[in-house]
């Protein structure tokens, strides 16, 4: 186990003493050592209310091999050995003597586990106070810091009752859980947008669900975590809407110019505002939906309000889904504008009684994963005032890069046949309200049919419709600071979405952080080896409470999880910056690779059918040295590596090839060869319900990325796809003459991949990808001129 810690601050001793006093702990370095130790350890068991109960707790803790804590305190000690202090500390952190660590050598265990310690015996009261401060900021076996663990056991449960005016509490630069999340005020409002996405001539009203600390009723203004969550009110069955992968790849007769595929700015109709009949501070509707996002819940107990809005076309709101369209962005922005006092909301949909976000400080962060993070990115690219930061986990930065790739229809990994219209059906939760749907059904079906036409599964081309869903082109508008989190094995929302957005905001005068993990399409707030919650606490305390805690400097610019050594995270100044710490190598496919042939015929669809394969089994088979697809691919290998290398950036291919058809699909996979127990891409549960989000509040599982129990012969590093008629970009088209050689350029998905010595790089070139592209039945023959083809790889030095 490694409990990496990137968010711990080390203030000077005077500041430490002030903070200890602030939370009610001993803080006088002149006080007797024994009295300070007794008071400190008593405070470390907040669940024990009486001295007798405290003595029982002390007796359960070993100080060394011959003395428990009760016995040690009874001696009225004047000092404490370093080993004794950390024997006690480890038990307080949730570790077990005799099974997790040896009482004769706690420091060795702490070093391996990456836990901090003081370097000497505690000879004076000041030493004890300093060591105790460090302990409070140290992570427990249960992922959170020791002070968080104390709070979960009731340390702060009466904190607000002791003051006339509720307030946030800071310790080690982070806001603490001094608010009772169980008493959160739950309410619903309807925000009037400028959007008319269902074309009924009225401004769409957007429902927003609010959870705010009860302390706001006593005058406390709080910042807001806002999650634009299209799934908030449920989803629909999409079986009937899901596309069967097409069997014919259309020949494109012509392309388009850059101007033709550039979306014009969306025009907003001039619609009358609803009349206001009165104003109130009291909501008229209770929030019956529970908060679904543990990350937000964690901050609710720390004095942040949490707001969810599903947006246009969802249950209890107006409008239609537009899947990444400007209407969805505008809907999210409308919520922020209400939270910052610049837009109107109502207590219900009909009587015109207005309500303000009077409890909001006007400082907002957008949070969430996947579609939720996508809308955070979209919101940031508007430059809306009051949005201070986004924490976007696996978000889409261009919808074309989600459903298309280089002129091809390419499904998100694991969702073959999905497209924008399918997701529209999935998230159109207004369908769940029969009374709403009876008057909408025809208009919705017409809207959906138009979306199906606009998305254009025939050509897969980049069009103005997709351009309107490309947030990166508006990246220059971003004013909010940005945290991006993405899985290096996320083939659903592929890494390009994060890295291209990271590059797009690189030169902006904002703070930005990038976290890359070894998972698929998953959250990381509950990954044990990373102090993500503490990192984001430090970040949001700075961003939303205005605390000068050096979050920008303390948190790494880029943090990457290693794919070889478990529970290892490395900090870097940037990602794939060719000007720093990188070297690029270009390999010729003929002279620098070995290959048995330079041609293949793509029988993948027939083989897929004959083998009764699934998308998952195909993805495994296509990168396996000996599989049923051996004749439907080129298999090129480099020599075995003599030393470790770290691939980081965007691999690039320049290919010269010929096909016997006027069009074709080309798929490429870069593969790590060599038997090894590689990481599972889904994190394993290591503590069921082990992460507590507040005192007597919700819990969630603690997870960790672990090596598999069995060896595998290969592992996908990255991949890419291209329509051979789109060798330059996704909108210009070239005519292919069958049998005649032509040139294609292709970027693979960005990656960071540690290749150990003894492994081999393999490049697999094939045709249709049964898991992601359409599935043509026509057999196409491919011949490559390997001598005129290259692979460029960026490596971290």
From Swiss-Prot:
<feature type="active site" description="Charge relay system">
    <location>
        <position position="521"/>
    </location>
</feature>
<keyword id="KW-0963">Cytoplasm</keyword>
<dbReference type="InterPro" id="IPR008252">
    <property type="entry name" value="Pept_S15_Xpro"/>
</dbReference>
<feature type="active site" description="Charge relay system">
    <location>
        <position position="370"/>
    </location>
</feature>
<comment type="function">
    <text>Removes N-terminal dipeptides sequentially from polypeptides having unsubstituted N-termini provided that the penultimate residue is proline.</text>
</comment>
<feature type="active site" description="Charge relay system">
    <location>
        <position position="490"/>
    </location>
</feature>
<comment type="subunit">
    <text>Homodimer.</text>
</comment>
<dbReference type="Pfam" id="PF08530">
    <property type="entry name" value="PepX_C"/>
</dbReference>
<dbReference type="InterPro" id="IPR036313">
    <property type="entry name" value="PepX_N_dom_sf"/>
</dbReference>
<keyword id="KW-0720">Serine protease</keyword>
<dbReference type="InterPro" id="IPR015251">
    <property type="entry name" value="PepX_N_dom"/>
</dbReference>
<dbReference type="GO" id="GO:0008236">
    <property type="term" value="F:serine-type peptidase activity"/>
</dbReference>
<dbReference type="GO" id="GO:0008239">
    <property type="term" value="F:dipeptidyl-peptidase activity"/>
</dbReference>
<dbReference type="InterPro" id="IPR029058">
    <property type="entry name" value="AB_hydrolase_fold"/>
</dbReference>
<dbReference type="GO" id="GO:0004177">
    <property type="term" value="F:aminopeptidase activity"/>
</dbReference>
<comment type="similarity">
    <text>Belongs to the peptidase S15 family.</text>
</comment>
<dbReference type="InterPro" id="IPR013736">
    <property type="entry name" value="Xaa-Pro_dipept_C"/>
</dbReference>
<dbReference type="InterPro" id="IPR000383">
    <property type="entry name" value="Xaa-Pro-like_dom"/>
</dbReference>
<dbReference type="GO" id="GO:0006508">
    <property type="term" value="P:proteolysis"/>
</dbReference>
<dbReference type="GO" id="GO:0005737">
    <property type="term" value="C:cytoplasm"/>
</dbReference>
<keyword id="KW-0645">Protease</keyword>
<keyword id="KW-0031">Aminopeptidase</keyword>
<dbReference type="Pfam" id="PF09168">
    <property type="entry name" value="PepX_N"/>
</dbReference>
<protein>
    <recommendedName>
        <fullName>Xaa-Pro dipeptidyl-peptidase</fullName>
        <ecNumber>3.4.14.11</ecNumber>
    </recommendedName>
</protein>
<keyword id="KW-0378">Hydrolase</keyword>
<dbReference type="InterPro" id="IPR008979">
    <property type="entry name" value="Galactose-bd-like_sf"/>
</dbReference>
<dbReference type="Pfam" id="PF02129">
    <property type="entry name" value="Peptidase_S15"/>
</dbReference>
């Amino acid at each position: 186990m490694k409990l990496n810690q990137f968010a711990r601050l080390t203030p000077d001793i005077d500041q430490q003493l002030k903070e200890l006093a602030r939370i009610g702990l001993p803080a006088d370095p002149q006080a007797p050592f024994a009295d300070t130790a007794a008071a400190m350890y008593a405070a470390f068991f907040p669940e024990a209310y009486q001295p007798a109960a405290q003595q029982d707790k002390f007796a359960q803790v070993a100080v060394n091999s011959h003395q428990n804590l009760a016995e040690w305190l009874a001696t009225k000690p004047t000092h404490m050995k370093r080993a004794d202090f950390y024997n006690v500390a480890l038990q307080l952190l949730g570790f077990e003597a005799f099974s997790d660590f040896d009482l004769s050598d706690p420091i060795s265990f702490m070093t391996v586990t990456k836990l901090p310690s003081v370097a000497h015996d505690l000879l004076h009261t000041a030493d004890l106070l300093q060591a105790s401060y460090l302990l409070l900021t140290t992570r427990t076996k249960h992922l959170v810091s020791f002070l968080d663990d104390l709070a979960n056991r009731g340390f702060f449960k009466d904190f607000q009752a002791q003051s006339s005016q509720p307030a946030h509490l800071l310790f080690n630069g982070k806001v603490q859980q001094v608010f009772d999340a169980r008493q959160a005020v739950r309410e619903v409002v309807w925000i009037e947008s400028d959007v008319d996405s269902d074309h009924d001539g009225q401004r769409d009203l957007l429902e927003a669900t609010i959870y705010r600390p009860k302390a706001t009723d006593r005058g406390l203004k709080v910042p807001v975590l806002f999650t634009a969550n299209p799934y908030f009110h449920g989803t629909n069955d999409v079986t009937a809407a899901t596309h069967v992968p097409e069997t014919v790849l259309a020949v494109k007769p012509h392309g388009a110019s850059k101007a033709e595929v550039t979306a014009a700015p969306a025009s907003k109709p001039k619609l009358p505002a609803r009349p206001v009949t009165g104003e109130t501070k009291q909501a008229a509707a209770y929030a019956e939906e529970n908060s679904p996002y543990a990350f937000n819940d964690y901050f609710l107990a720390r004095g942040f309000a949490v707001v969810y809005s599903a947006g246009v076309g969802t249950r209890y709101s107006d409008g239609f889904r537009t899947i990444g369209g400007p209407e969805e962005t505008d809907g999210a922005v409308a919520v922020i504008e209400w939270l910052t006092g610049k837009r109107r909301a109502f207590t219900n949909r009909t009587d015109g009684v207005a309500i303000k976000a009077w409890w909001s400080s006007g400082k907002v962060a957008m949070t969430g994963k996947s579609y939720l993070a996508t809308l955070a990115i979209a919101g940031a690219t508007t430059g809306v005032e009051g949005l201070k930061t986004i924490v976007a986990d696996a978000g889409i930065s261009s919808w074309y890069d989600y459903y298309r790739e280089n002129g091809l229809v390419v499904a998100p990994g694991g969702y073959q046949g999905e497209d924008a219209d399918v997701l529209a059906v999935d998230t159109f939760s207004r369908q769940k309200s029969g009374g709403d749907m009876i008057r909408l059904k025809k208009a919705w079906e017409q809207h959906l049919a138009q979306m199906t036409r606009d998305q254009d599964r025939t050509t897969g081309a980049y069009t103005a419709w997709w351009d309107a869903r490309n947030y990166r082109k508006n990246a220059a508008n971003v004013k909010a600071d940005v945290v991006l989190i993405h899985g290096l094995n996320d083939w659903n929302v592929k890494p390009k979405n994060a890295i291209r957005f990271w590059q797009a905001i690189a030169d902006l005068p904002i703070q930005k952080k990038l976290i890359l993990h070894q998972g698929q399409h998953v959250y990381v707030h509950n990954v044990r080896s990373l102090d993500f919650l503490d990192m984001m606490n430090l970040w949001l305390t700075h961003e939303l409470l205005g605390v000068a805690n050096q979050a920008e400097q303390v948190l790494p610019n880029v943090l990457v999880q290693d794919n070889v050594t478990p529970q290892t995270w490395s900090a870097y100044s940037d990602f794939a910056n060719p000007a720093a710490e990188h070297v690029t190598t270009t390999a010729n496919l003929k002279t620098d690779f070995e290959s048995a042939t330079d041609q293949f015929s793509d029988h993948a669809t027939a083989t897929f059918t004959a083998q009764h394969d699934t998308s998952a089994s195909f993805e495994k088979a296509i990168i396996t040295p000996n599989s049923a697809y051996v004749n439907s691919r080129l298999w090129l290998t480099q020599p075995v590596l003599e030393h470790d290398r770290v691939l980081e950036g965007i691999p690039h291919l320049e290919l010269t090839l010929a096909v016997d058809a006027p069009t074709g699909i080309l798929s490429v996979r870069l593969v790590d060869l060599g038997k090894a127990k590689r990481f599972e891409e889904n994190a394993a549960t290591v503590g069921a319900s082990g992460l507590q989000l507040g005192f007597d509040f919700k819990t969630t599982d603690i997870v960790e990325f672990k090596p598999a129990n069995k060896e595998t012969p290969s592992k996908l590093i990255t991949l890419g796809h291209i329509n051979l008629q789109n060798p330059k970009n996704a909108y210009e088209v070239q005519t292919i003459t069958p049998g005649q050689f032509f040139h294609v350029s292709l970027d693979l998905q960005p990656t960071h991949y540690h290749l150990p010595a003894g492994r081999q790089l393999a490049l697999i070139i094939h045709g249709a990808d049964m898991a992601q592209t359409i599935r043509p039945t026509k057999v196409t023959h491919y011949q490559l001129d390997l001598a005129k083809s290259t692979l460029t790889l960026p490596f971290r030095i």
